[in-house]
């Protein structure tokens, strides 16, 4: 069954990057979109150089021009791009053809998430409508994602709820930012350690459980409009 994929996002310092790696993270995220956790590409490149090659490094963008996304990822030596805005399927595919890896983020409960396979991103990231807000969305909405896509679950995850999230959603991976911080952009050692440990333990327990019962189809009327805003907010906590 393998191990759950764990991504620690919002990395702003080398110390936090090395901490996450030491605790067992599989991937790191550097936020280039406007945010309290925003980092300059040259600084992210410097940190990425000090990270073991087996650890994936993603640049997180929101509504950035595809050409600029490709240039920043490749010039910074990152493993891939995470597109966290209103990027179209065409834009996402264009970027995916020019960077090593791609992750497209969708808001849980959105109409786009229900047809996420059109973006040709696998895995995809399923987040709260307000990324970085620390808010948890209705996890039952994960059932709307088309079969065959690997889901990285995000949105308000922390050490205290990641096990429940994994047990309910059974995602391929989990992503956390504000849930393991002591201040915006600065990670907390204990929180990072406990988050990863709890995620690994919960994933291990899934091997002993029967497959979940089929989830009823999501009523399209319950999905948010394609034009609904996908706002980028930051948790104050």
Labelled PLM ranges:
Residues 1-237:
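Conserved N-terminal beta1-alpha1 strand-loop-helix module at the mouth
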């Amino acid at each position: 069954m393998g191990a759950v994929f764990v991504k620690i996002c919002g990395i702003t310092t080398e110390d936090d990057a090395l901490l996450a790696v030491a605790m067992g993270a599989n991937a790191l995220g550097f936020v280039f979109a406007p945010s309290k956790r925003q980092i300059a590409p040259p600084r992210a490149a410097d940190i990425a150089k000090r990270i073991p090659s087996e650890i994936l490094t993603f640049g997180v963008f929101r509504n950035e021009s595809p050409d600029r996304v490709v240039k920043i990822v490749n010039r910074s030596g990152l493993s891939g791009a995470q597109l966290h805005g209103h990027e179209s399927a065409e834009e996402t595919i264009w970027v995916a053809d020019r960077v090593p890896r791609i992750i497209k983020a969708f808001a849980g409960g959105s109409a786009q998430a229900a047809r996420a396979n059109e973006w040709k991103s696998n895995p995809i990231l399923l987040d709260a409508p307000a990324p970085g807000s620390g808010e948890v969305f209705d996890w039952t909405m994960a059932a709307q994602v088309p079969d065959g896509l690997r889901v990285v679950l995000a949105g308000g995850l922390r050490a205290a709820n990641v096990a429940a999230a994994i047990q309910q959603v059974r995602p391929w991976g989990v992503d956390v930012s504000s849930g393991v911080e002591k201040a915006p952009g600065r990670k907390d050692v204990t929180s990072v350690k406990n988050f990863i440990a709890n995620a690994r333990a919960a994933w291990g327990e899934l091997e002993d459980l029967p497959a979940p019962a089929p989830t009823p189809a999501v009523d399209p009327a319950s999905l948010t409009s394609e034009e609904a805003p996908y706002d980028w907010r930051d948790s104050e906590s």
